[in-house]
Amino acid sequence: IEAAHGRAPAVATGVKRSNPENIVFTYQGDGDLASIGMAHTVHAAARNENITVIFINNAIYGMTGGQMAPTSLPGQITQTSPYGRDVNHCGYPIRVCEMLSQLEGPEYLARVTVNNVKNVKNAKKAIKKAFENQVNGKGFSLVEVLSSCPTNWGLTPKKALEWIDEKMIPYYPLGVYKDRSLQGKED
């Protein structure tokens, strides 16, 4: 099923509630989820809807020409911020996992990346956990994947992978931001 831009969590909620046995997930970019779809994402998380959200954060509107996204980094140059994102004018980037972790509803929130083999393995584990949570009826899971956009970043693919390490991860730290299955357990 294809949903209107930003509305995937609302559509996924309807599909899951009407067909609870189905595995339902959304695959959304940062322009979709963190901009026009933010309200739908927040409320699905707050209600702990039993869906899985895969959120691709490449810090740019990659499919429409490279405009500044809600997740573009401070100082990041884009088509609509040719001198770099000015936080005094455009505000700060939205850290989705950190924001959603303040809600009581979500079952699982994690941020991963896919810029090397080790990180791909960790991403697979996080995505598997998110789908297992849904299968087991535990509720809302979101996995944010820091991803490259070499074309719109104006970088080679190799440099784009390095940019994730050098620029994105310091601003968007990797890790599990919420896992209710671990609450109350000692490490």
Where are the regions that the model predicts?
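Short, hinge-like loop/turn segments at secondary-structure boundaries
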Residues: 1, 44, 69-73, 159-162
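Active-site-proximal loop->helix
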Residues: 38-43, 63-77
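Compact, aliphatic and Gly/Pro-tolerant "microcore" segments centered on a short helix or tight beta-hairpin
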Residues: 53-54, 66, 100
